[in-house]
Amino acid sequence: MNASESCEELNATLSAYLESLDSRQRQVEEIRQLHHKVWAMKTNHAPIIEHRAGSRVEKQTRICPNDIRSDIDFMLEVNNVVVFAKGNGGICFQPTSRDGYFGRILISDQYRDSLMIDTHLKAIFTESSLKRDKFSNRFVLVPNVFKQNVVRESGLKYQQTKSPQSTGPSIPGRGVVNEYDVVPCLRLNTWPEETTTWISRGKPLSVFDPSWRKKVLVASPVFLVAAGEINSCFQKEQFRTSFSMPEIECFKKLPNLVRQLFGLAKYVFTYLLSSVGFLSWFHIKYLLFWMVEKDEIDWNNISPVCFLFHLMDSIKQSVRDGNVQHFFLDNCNIFPEHRRTYEREYAYDQILSDKQLVTECLKRLLRTELLETSRTVMASEFTNTESRLVSSNTYCDGYLTRLLSVIVFVWQETSASEKMSSSFAEKILEDCGVNEYTRKLVTILELYFRGNVPGKLSLNSLAHGAFLAYMQGDFAVCLSSCSQHVTSTCVRDDDCILGVTLTRYDRTPHLDEPLRFALDRLEQKFGTCPRVSLHPLFFLKHVLLQCELKKRDNGLKCLDTLFSDLHGFSKSLSPRTPYCGLLSYQAVAFLVIEGYNEYFKRENIDIRLYETDTYVKLDISLTPATCSFDLR
């Protein structure tokens, strides 16, 4: 096979891979949107409006290199505070640079007094967050104090991993499952006047046409985020304009192929260039937007390899010129000149000139994602890609289980208020009923919310019904559910498997020792009690074993058989669903098995014990964070 044929083969495989990957991401998009909506119901605090930003809501096709975690981006807007883009209002943005990118937020004495007595806002606009400006008769909002106050008042639960930096807008951290990038912000009352060229420069038949730009101008807000300009004397007092919402609209306007190729470009950039520490993905994203706007290319038919090579040339030119123009602000160069060194320039030039390196990077991606083998694979071996991709019949199960988990958790939190709990239940049932995937949750949710037993029993309804009865100490109902389905160890391919959720609210006297052991060990690992999902059939088998332990009528032989069956089934469970790693069905099941081992040893019950796989020994750094969108 010659080089041209090999490239065609690689392009065809990449196109099939991206289409399959993207279609699955779009399938679960509404599930994830509802997940976020439910979570926002829990964290809805009067002074804060929570926005999602970043690659997920931009609908980039997400592909993460190994060991690179996919974080979740939140923008926390302070409600009922709008900053004037110019003028002398009670609170206004005063640019400190000609391009309007950076500036300070100035507040009048009268407006300051009103903020500090407002019931919801006084905890954000504190004495320490406002200092008298020596250049004007006003107060300056102190960015770092503002950021900390907003995060504290938002109620967002996560562990901060870094101290806030004056040059960065976010307060990064991590939750039990994912990394978080949290950005407090304030809304501008209008787009800056420095955006007039962006509004008018679109061509009628271009991707970003003029009529679309006018709609974005009206519908998408511009925020101010706490970030200072390198080497500026005002650095610790500065905010900068953020166009994260218009950027989301740009991605919505892109042709599907280009949106998918953005994800591929991000993978290649992260894999090859992120360690150099020069340009960030933010710079590359704007270069890509400029490519789409300026270059006369048929974006609906460009090949993946050609797209990447074109981008590489654009990055090389940008580094040589020291120029990355802001996509929205006029005459605003955001090139990171302070990071420029000979070594970094040389590394970029060498890597971006080596097109074979990019090709090998793409082949490595396909090997990792599709073949799961370390052997050398040529492009010709990637034929029949679609047949290697898993069926999507049960693809959404993990995402539905995650959604069910957060719904149950928030419902448990609101149960203290009957009115709030009823309102929450009605809203969730309505939202779940509109999508073909989330509709699968309705029967189970009615079981939780209303106690409605479905007419047609399934593994899911039996397991969740048994769990609710079990946590109330009603073993008769549990045994009835178990006897109807526990003997069936296989489920039809088209069945949706919804895990049983275990949370900190289930730490009641009815919670047995093995389940409590699993929760305790995971809490030790993560510093908080995570929401745990048990495979429904595993839970039913567990209940049978618990019932046998309580009665002990049949001697040790029956107990030994049930424990052996539970252990054998746990080995067949997925280590990747509903999360990869320590919150997977398999890992949680192994922890329950360890809990049984501890119990049997302490009670001197003489039955065979089972060693579980070493990766659930929690001293190993195995995290459940999303590293890539799993096709395996």
Swiss-Prot record:
Disulfide bonds: none annotated. Transmembrane segments: none annotated. Mg(2+) binds at residues 71, 73, 181. Its EC number is 2.7.7.-. It is an enzyme of class 2 (transferase). Keywords: Immunity, Innate immunity, Magnesium, Manganese, Metal-binding, Nucleotidyltransferase, Transferase. GO terms for biological process: innate immune response. Mn(2+) binds at residue 295. One of its GO terms (molecular function) is metal ion binding. Its cofactor is Mg(2+); Mn(2+). InterPro entries: Mab-21_HhH/H2TH-like, MAB21L/cGLR. The keyword Cell division does not apply. Nucleotidyltransferase that catalyzes the formation of some cyclic nucleotide and plays a key role in innate immunity. Directly binds some unknown ligand, activating the nucleotidyltransferase activity, leading to synthesis of a second messenger that binds to and activates Sting, thereby triggering the immune response via activation of the NF-kappa-B transcription factor. Belongs to the mab-21 family. This is Cyclic GMP-AMP synthase-like receptor 2. It comes from Crassostrea virginica. The gene is cGLR2.
